[in-house]
Amino acid sequence: MAVIKCKPTSPGRRHVVKVVNSDLHKGKPFAGLLAKKSKSGGRNNTGRITSRHIGGGHKQHYRLIDFKRNKDGIPAKVERLEYDPNRTANIALVLYADGERRYIIAAKGMKAGDSIQSGIDAEIKSGNAMPLRNIPVGSVVHAVEMKPGKGAQIARSAGAYVQVIARDGAYATLRLRSGEMRKVPVDCRATLGEVGNAEHMLRQLGKAGAKRWRGVRPTVRGVAMNPVDHPHGGGEGRTSGGRHPVSPWGQPTKGYKTRSNKRTDKYIVRRRNKK
């Protein structure tokens, strides 16, 4: 995988930094694992904008990813690695011995021809999935379930991982990248190793149009609006907003905590690190 800084042949190329992976499949994705993906433009069923800064972008198909990894005892072979426009991680097309194909999140170091397996009898190696009760303490894992059988929810993006730091009775304690320590049932499955494509964080799009290709619309500052549109709007000339930063609906922003307490808080052993 190479990180390439483009030559400044035009203003739009001057700041572009690309991550090129020559191992990725250059053809079309496997048609049997594609689903329709329609764009909402950030609107709900009444046509009102409920999520700002969304709209346009290239048409995409959703890739059906196997987050459960529940095909136990059947060895599989990695056919190829592919780009997935729906996530930062790359995905791997795997062929099971019984002829079924599935997409999974590509682990770090995974390549075409590798053998993987799921279940309690699987070998302790990167790419294999098994319950947390069978994973040695201290191991680095990704694609971790929060409820047994629900499918992976933790550590699915490029370069992500969590560490199994303890196992006591019915729960395993995980250390997340954020610094949070959390208990998860030992029957939840996880995949050994880190998620691949860690160089994704080095990428620079270089121009506004590259954001538009991805369906992201501009973000307008509140101080540049009129008073009818934002609490920071209006004033003669340039202003600082005149108050502590708030959202368009008057809720404090920049550090204001909005998370409500949940019954699952009891599983959080230590809160994430403060930035």
From Swiss-Prot:
Gene Ontology CC terms: large ribosomal subunit
Keyword tags: Ribonucleoprotein, Ribosomal protein, RNA-binding, rRNA-binding
Domain of life per record: Bacteria
Signal peptide limits: none
Single GO biological process annotation from the record: cytoplasmic translation
Function description: One of the primary rRNA binding proteins. Required for association of the 30S and 50S subunits to form the 70S ribosome, for tRNA binding and peptide bond formation. It has been suggested to have peptidyltransferase activity; this is somewhat controversial. Makes several contacts with the 16S rRNA in the 70S ribosome.
Protein name: Large ribosomal subunit protein uL2
Origin organism lineage: Bacteria, Pseudomonadati, Pseudomonadota, Gammaproteobacteria, Alteromonadales
